[in-house]
């Protein structure tokens, strides 16, 4: 039996889909577990949150094998530099704040960007964003799993960074 996933506009076999999710992280992680988005969403819903992951996709539980930099976007009022969700810089480079909001299904349009360095040995979730706040999502998000990890550094306004 061959695993196949349809995500966005393309259909891929299971391994291609999972490799695409990892992107530039592929050689920097150890994969601990594959979980259904539904099972991870159930955990978030039990805590009173909306489902963060797209249904019928896979969430990867991974451990970083080397120090790795990510970015976090925020508006400075409703969200701040430090927080539990980050993304790869290459996933938002060149996007406007409105495009980032749509791709990552953010409640508020981000204004600022910060760099987040996670350490080798940090364990995180990585998966495809589901619909929220009137947006379809579809981007790949990294969940710090409610751990207080990472070194957060302000980079400035998204418009100046992109």
Range-by-range predicted roles:
Residues 2, 9-162:
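Catalytic toxin/effector domains delivered as secreted proteins or via bacterial secretion systems
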């Amino acid at each position: 039996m061959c695993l196949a996933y349809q995500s966005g506009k393309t259909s891929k076999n299971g391994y291609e889909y999972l490799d695409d999710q990892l992107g530039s992280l592929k050689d920097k992680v150890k994969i601990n577990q594959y979980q259904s988005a539904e099972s991870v969403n159930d955990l978030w819903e039990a805590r009173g949150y909306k489902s963060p992951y797209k249904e019928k996709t896979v969430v990867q539980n991974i451990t970083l094998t080397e120090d790795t930099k990510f970015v976090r976007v925020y508006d400075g009022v409703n969200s701040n530099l430090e927080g539990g969700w980050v993304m790869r810089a290459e996933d938002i480079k060149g996007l406007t704040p409105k495009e980032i909001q749509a791709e990552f299904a953010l409640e508020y349009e981000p204004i600022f960007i910060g760099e987040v360095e996670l350490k080798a040995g940090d364990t995180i979730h990585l998966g495809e964003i589901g619909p929220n706040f009137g947006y379809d999502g579809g981007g790949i998000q990294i969940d710090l799993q409610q751990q207080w990890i990472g070194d957060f550094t302000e980079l400035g306004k998204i418009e100046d960074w992109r």
